[in-house]
Amino acid sequence: MKSSIDILPDGSITTPKGFKAGAIYAGIKKKSKNNLDLAILYSDTPCIAAGIFTTNKFRAAPVYISEHNLGFTDNRAIVVNSGCANAGTGEAGMADAIEMVKATAESLNMQPKDVLIASTGVIGHRLPIDKIKENVRLIGLSQRNGHEFARAIMTTDTRSKEIAVQVNIEGFQFYIAGAAKGAGMIHPNMATMLGFITTDASVSKEFLQFALKEAADVSFNMITVDGDTSTNDSLFMLSNGQAENPTFAGNTEYSLVFQQALTIVCQNLAKSIARDGEGAKRLIEIQVEGAANLEDARLIARVIAGSPLVKTAVHGADPNWGRILAAAGRAGADFDIDMVDLYLGESPVLLKGARTGVDEKELSSWLRQVEVIIKLNLNLGQGKAAAWGCDLSAEYVKINADYTT
């Protein structure tokens, strides 16, 4: 079977057929050069929807509502605000989220159950619900507004994060696209910060949820900036079927290509989040192979990527690779140190548990790259995984010390 997956140079969340978006400044966050803080993603036709949400016990109101509405069919829209998380706001916050969904549904002439919702921003503050209800009705929807949607969901992000791919499989074509936000409080578990995926492919609901979970497990669930999991983490996917392909379901050749394309989209967005970590200068990729199993490989990769000592060493271009081994050793997975190989880029610093004597000045120079790849081979089994993080700088401390002041 012939197939191709191509990343489009100017793709956005509205690249798939039938999707529109719009954004406006509603006064939720302080005025800035990016004067957008309220957005809608919309499909011309009803969608099959899937979602994955935060495992943080301190969940925000919009998470509960979206999880509930995903239980219905025909979801068609997602309303998103930035600047206020609507978490830690009690019954009043839940009422505000419900009002936000109702106002959006009325403006789009649909039922509230058809609308999903997401919020991001400062915890513990009420939404300015009157401003939101007034402005959500003014949002103009267009296929051209995908980039505006990606900008409107940003908080401390320094750049928008979006991608679209075109997939061709033996005579038919479809698109998968995505937008995400996140730069701090990034340590997801079964979710991401905020992520939105669209496709015009026809997909069964069961397979869509399965495929999204599979893609998240090798992308959003493998990134870390600071070890904190948000109260609002949500990942949504909408499929409107306008590509009119044979419906993807189960383990078929077609569905495997769909899964591959979805994984490309999710990994691209996840790496963009890690690369844009608050105050970060470098993207760190941890590659673990030779683990006893997949779970051990993922565990070790995530612990190394999240280690403050590893992150600060990379920031300072300090080739103190003992920190990498120490992080791997505390991950809780079994391995034999006398079998371990460790590479910084292509340079072996440890082979079969013994130091190789690579010149540290050369390593320090290499660590100044914008993308740093660390490879650990346990030489024990077939387990293999990758995780992504970023360096930890003084700027991260400054951003978060002054976040609300």
UniProtKB/Swiss-Prot annotation:
CDD domains from the UniProt entry: OAT
UniProt pathway annotation: Amino-acid biosynthesis; L-arginine biosynthesis; L-ornithine and N-acetyl-L-glutamate from L-glutamate and N(2)-acetyl-L-ornithine (cyclic): step 1/1; Amino-acid biosynthesis; L-arginine biosynthesis; N(2)-acetyl-L-ornithine from L-glutamate: step 1/4
Keyword terms: Acyltransferase, Amino-acid biosynthesis, Arginine biosynthesis, Autocatalytic cleavage, Cytoplasm, Multifunctional enzyme, Transferase
Positions contributing to substrate binding: T155, K181, T192, E278, N400, T405
Database matches in Gene3D superfamilies: ArgJ beta chain, C-terminal domain, L-amino peptidase D-ALA esterase/amidase
EC number from the UniProt entry: 2.3.1.35, 2.3.1.1
Catalysed transformations (reactions): N(2)-acetyl-L-ornithine + L-glutamate = N-acetyl-L-glutamate + L-ornithine; L-glutamate + acetyl-CoA = N-acetyl-L-glutamate + CoA + H(+)
Sites marked Cleavage: A191, T192
Catalytic center residues: T192 (nucleophile)
Subunit structure: Heterotetramer of two alpha and two beta chains.
Similarity comment text for this entry: Belongs to the ArgJ family.
Name of this chain's protein: Arginine biosynthesis bifunctional protein ArgJ
Gene designation: argJ
